[in-house]
Design a protein with these regions (language model features):
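Acidic, glycine-rich A-domain
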Residues: 1-254
Length: 254
């Protein structure tokens, strides 16, 4: 079910590639970062409850005190913020090799990962492609997906920089899109955070819109926000409700 890439990648080269991408953020990325951090950051909301009979004396309530009222105090209230978890799923099928699509996806993932790290949001990154195995019966044919764990839940970003730097070396094989998305949705739905977001980066080559509608219904049922980023293709826009397309990393800042 999983593909190991550690033995095949050159760690030093991959770490340098990661560093080169991080050191060259697209112009305007700061605005994207600010908007995403605002969405994801967990902040407690602090307020005050007035007209209390105990607590901190409310100086604005002196008029009520003069008329004999006892509810002249206020209390500090803290509303616990929503917490977020993010899963990033990368299409590593053979079509992503065309036109440097996988490299664009790699750049998007690395910059997105840095934003999530700064926001202190737990996240994972994995790629998917076929394993060469298929399941058949009288009603359907399904390709078994294989996943590439670039970053698992709980791992620090610093510990996986080489793996993220190796993303562009991992494209090949078929596209088990439906089964991979279902697996990723089920995985993030088990997280304890109140807000769950699944990003999929794909060229959507060969995707069937009707299948993706079923995936969207599943995401809605599980309470997961599904966001597609089309890579060098607008096909993702036809397949997913929340979607956009980029041809270059600079468009991420748009």
């Amino acid at each position: 079910m999983f593909i190991s890439i550690e033995e095949k990648m050159n760690k030093l080269i991959c770490e340098k590639k990661y560093s080169d991408i991080v050191s060259a953020p697209p112009q305007g990325l700061g605005a994207t970062q600010t908007n995403l951090q605002r969405l994801l950051r967990s902040l407690d909301t602090v307020g005050w409850s007035t007209h209390e009979e105990t607590g901190r004396l409310d100086r604005r309530a002196f008029t009520r005190f003069a008329t004999g009222s006892a509810n002249i105090f206020s209390r500090r209230q803290v509303a616990e913020a929503e917490t977020s978890a993010v899963s990033i799923l990368i299409d590593c099928s053979g079509s992503m090799e065309a036109g440097n699509r996988i490299r664009t996806a790699q750049s998007v993932v690395i910059h997105l990962s840095k934003i999530l790290q700064r926001s202190r949001v737990p996240f994972c990154v994995q790629g998917f492609r076929t394993s060469g195995e298929s399941v058949y019966n009288n009603d359907f044919h399904m390709e078994r997906p294989k996943f590439i764990r670039f970053k698992q839940w709980g791992q620090s970003l610093q510990s996986v920089v080489a793996k993220l730097g190796a993303i562009d070396q991992c494209a090949g094989g078929g596209t088990p899109d439906y089964s991979s998305l279902v697996n990723a949705l089920e995985d993030i739905s088990k997280r304890e955070e109140s807000r769950k977001i699944l990003f999929i980066l794909t060229d959507a080559s060969g995707y069937i819109p009707e299948h993706m509608k079923h995936v969207q219904k599943m995401a809605d049922t599980l309470g997961v926000t599904l966001i597609a980023i089309g890579i060098h293709s607008v096909d993702a826009i036809d397949c997913f409700v929340n979607s956009s397309a980029v041809n270059d990393i600079s468009e991420l800042a748009g």
